[in-house]
Swiss-Prot record:
A single BP term in Gene Ontology: lipopolysaccharide transport
Subcellular location: Cell outer membrane
Stated name of the protein: LPS-assembly protein LptD
Signal sequence annotation: 1-24
NCBIfam families from the UniProt entry: PRK03761.1 (NF002997)
Primary gene name: lptD
Predominant subcellular localization, coarse grouping: membrane
Entry keyword set: Cell outer membrane, Disulfide bond, Membrane, Signal
Function: Together with LptE, is involved in the assembly of lipopolysaccharide (LPS) at the surface of the outer membrane.
């Protein structure tokens, strides 16, 4: 048994199988032009019983034991063909075998081919019964896929399952190019397992040996196999030189893992990144455990911390059992608040402001469902560590539709709130919400009348510290009962646009809603989970101004809006525009003195919102939205983008995004107090582009400029060269990475990345643009 020791050489070889699976069709077709195809009718099933056909210029022999054929000898059986200048056929009876053993020796210009491989050499041998074949001092070429090489001895075994090379070489480069190759004392290519095993392997770039390994495995197909993946290297101002060496472990058909040693020069250690994926009867999930044993930079910056170990744990699970039980996990936790500032990770970002740890178990049958959950938050702030967790929370829904003309629902919730600080208020909240609806509709409109009762009880504890520092004191026990009444009407009109655009249809969809909720003073209730909701067009018609249940604003308002859509003759939506407003007859209030606009007594048209989408053509698209809130005295949020998209590799997008500081403060008050970079709001204009710039060259770029700070926000540039046997990618990224409180300016991280993949081993010929777009700090979002 030969010892199997994977090394860095394997990482350079195994790249193609696990690289991105986008397909550049033109490059793939170009590469396949240099690969031979099987052009004879394919014979299925067992070919051993098929007759052997021999053509030659001359033949002589001692029938039936021996025969010699000379001059353009051509032997065929099933899918196999052997050609040579001279062939000696031997046939002998084997004890216990019903058929004689037939072998051939071939001399001069030996050519063997089947639907899998072509072998060429000066001398050959074959067993016509088993299809075992030997060719000496020759070369080989795979059929229908890239892969070729040379060997002292080439053997076909196991009904053409195995190709075995003695002192052989392998490359996926097309004939005439030996950019890279692998040479080994023995190479075994297993077509069923789609793998090549190589002993005493030397990896060469051109004629120069670069790496050596006593043993390695090389994937030669798209089948899942354990092995090293694409190695990666980059340089960042945060961690200096970084190198990734991922290893894929195919544990079982329903589970696998990726183990990545991640070396960071500045940190002085290796972070072990372990990703585990599974599929079971209870559902599917993914776990990630990243662990850095020690961090010399963190130790220097935080001398008072007992440990410099850095770690991340992430778990996402979703599953259904017995059609009624539901299990969900969304859990992210890190060792310290600075983790996402120091390390890039797809499971979190410093701009999120917090990480969530949520577990839930649900039960659902017809007309009823219940969920028990726990939810905690880890705030990424060393100044403000206060956060509330729900430990536990019970949500119950009961539905009963078609009760006469009515639909009914009862929603209930019980939750216990706990704070990370010992001196902050805590509470148990019980909420009950019965609802009755009267829905009426026809083919051109609908009206829904709804009435509900909002009944909530609070039992609050640990109030001494808060009450001693605030004029408005919290109550240990508080009840809030609020009826709610709503009427929501919609109509849909449509017309043919034969005069302007034959085959096109335009709709006009007016909508009006009246909402009434009486005022209840909620100043004696602490705000545990409520925040202002975004008021885009669809948000204008919400029942609530705030998310959560701690703040339910009074309402005596009418919301009106209109949407118009245009469909082409294939029923594809080409254009839509929506405009709406909320008109307040009385001020919307909660009694919370911390909500500044409740002191303004503003009524009338306070909130406006609009959204639009225009698919100008199959390649051009425009999308935008704006929300104006007079309570904030300005535009709250807006966004717009225009995009040209020819295909997945050719696109250009211009976009703008805006959020006022007042809006950020109202929606994220705790995060706003510590996120200095957003004190002036967000006003950024950006561009994203991806394009093949020359033959086999592609480029991706993104640039965002902060118009408030008059400086660059984030940028990225990536260039990739793709050929039939390798691809090289170089990328640069500059991104916002926190705020320096001492120097009062933003902190940026600069990163330069580089990687190589070997092509032709799998079906991937992608130009790399989609992967580079997704890896950007501000990921590309499709407008079309």
């Amino acid at each position: 048994m030969k010892k199997r020791i994977p090394t860095l050489l394997a990482t350079m070889i195994a790249t193609a199988l696990y690289s991105q699976q986008g397909l550049a069709a033109d490059l793939a077709s170009q590469c396949m032009l240099g690969v031979p195809s099987y052009d004879r009718p394919l014979v299925q099933g067992d070919t051993n019983d098929l007759p052997v056909t021999i053509n030659a210029d001359h033949a002589k022999g001692d029938y039936p034991d021996d025969a010699v054929f000379t001059g353009s000898v051509d032997i065929m059986q099933g899918n196999s063909r052997l050609q040579a200048d001279e062939v000696q056929l031997h046939q002998k009876e084997a004890p216990g075998q019903p058929e004689p053993v037939r072998t051939v020796d071939a001399l001069g210009n030996v050519h063997y081919d089947d639907n899998q491989v072509i072998l060429k050499g000066p001398k050959g041998w074959a067993n016509l019964n088993t299809k075992d074949t030997n060719v000496w001092e020759g070369d080989y070429q795979m059929v229908g896929r890239q892969g070729r090489g040379k060997a002292d001895l080439m053997k076909q075994r196991g009904e053409n399952r195995y190709t075995i090379l003695d002192n052989g070489s392998f490359t996926s480069c097309l004939p005439g190019s030996d950019t890279w190759s692998v040479v080994g004392s023995e190479i075994i290519h297993d077509r069923e397992e789609q793998v090549a095993e190589i002993w005493n392997a030397r990896f060469k770039v051109g004629p120069v040996p670069i790496f050596y390994s006593p043993y390695l495995q090389l994937p030669v197909g798209d089948k899942r196999r354990s092995g090293f993946l694409i190695p990666n290297a980059k340089y960042t101002t945060t961690n200096y030189f970084e190198f990734y060496l991922p290893y894929y472990w195919n544990i079982a058909p329903n589970m696998d893992a990726t183990i990545t040693p991640h070396y960071m020069h500045r940190r002085g250690n290796i972070m072990w990144e372990n990703e585990f994926r599974y599929l079971s009867q209870a559902g599917a999930g993914l776990m990630e455990l990243d662990y850095l044993p020690s961090d010399k930079v963190y130790k220097d910056e935080h001398p008072n911390d007992d440990s410099s170990r850095r770690w991340l744990f992430y778990w996402n699970h979703s599953g259904v059992m017995d059609q009624v039980w539901r299990f969900n996990v969304d859990y992210t936790k890190v060792s310290d608040p600075s983790y996402f500032n120091d390390f890039d990770n797809k499971y979190g970002s410093s701009t999120d402001g917090y990480a969530t740890q949520k577990f839930s178990v649900g039960y659902a049958v017809q007309n009823f469902n219940a969920t028990v959950s726990t939810k905690q938050f880890q705030v990424f702030s060393e100044q403000n560590t206060s956060s509330y967790s729900a430990e536990p929370q019970l949500d119950v829904n009961y539905y009963q539709n078609d009760v006469g003309p009515f639909d009914t629902r009862i929603y209930g919730q019980a939750v216990h709130f706990v704070n990370t600080r010992d001196d902050m208020p805590e509470a148990t909240r019980v909420h009950l919400e019965p609802t009755i609806n009267l829905p009426l509709s026809n083919n051109w409109g609908s009206i829904n009348t709804e009435a509900k009762l909002l009944a909530t009880h609070y039992q609050q504890t640990n109030l001494d510290w808060y009450n001693s520092r605030n004029t408005t004191r919290l109550a240990e026990s508080a009840n809030r009962v609020m009826p709610q009444f709503k009427v929501d009407g919609r109509m849909v009109f449509e017309r043919d646009m034969e005069m302007l655009a034959p085959g096109y249809t335009q709709t006009l969809e007016p909508r009006a809603q009246y909402l009434y909720v009486p005022y209840r003073d909620q100043s004696k209730i602490y705000n545990y989970d409520s925040s202002l909701l975004q008021s885009d067009y669809s948000g204008l018609f919400r029942d609530r101004t705030y998310g959560g249940l701690d703040r339910i604003a009074s309402a005596n308002q009418v919301t009106t809006g209109v949407t118009s859509r245009i469909y082409d003759d294939a029923a594809v939506e080409r254009f839509n525009i929506s405009v709406g407003q909320i008109y307040y007859f009385t001020e919307s209030r909660t009694g919370d003195d911390n909500i500044t606009w409740e002191n303004d007594d503003k009524t009338g048209s306070l909130v406006w919102a609009g959204d639009t989408y225009w698919r100008i053509s199959d390649r051009w698209g425009l999308r935008g939205g704006i929300q104006y809130d007079t309570r904030l005295d300005n535009v709250a949020t807006s966004n717009s983008s225009i995009e040209y998209r020819r295909d997945e590799d050719r696109l250009v997008q211009l976009n703008y995004r805006y959020a006022s500081p007042e809006y950020i403060q109202a929606t994220l008050p705790k995060y706003y107090s510590t996120a200095e970079q957003y004190k002036n709001g967000i006003s950024q204009v950006g561009a994203v582009a991806s394009w093949p710039i020359a033959d086999r060259w592609s480029i991706v770029g993104a640039y965002y400029y902060d118009t408030n700070a008059n400086k660059q926000a984030d940028s990225m540039l990536g260039v990739q060269y793709s050929s039939c046997c390798y691809a090289i990618r170089v990328g640069y990224e500059r991104k916002l990475n926190g705020w320096d409180n001492d120097k009062q300016h933003a902190v940026y991280d600069n990163a330069i990345g580089f990687n190589i993949e070997l092509r032709g081993l799998s079906s991937n010929y992608g130009l790399g643009t989609q992967e580079m777009l997704r890896s950007n700090i501000l990921p590309y979002q499709n407008t079309l």
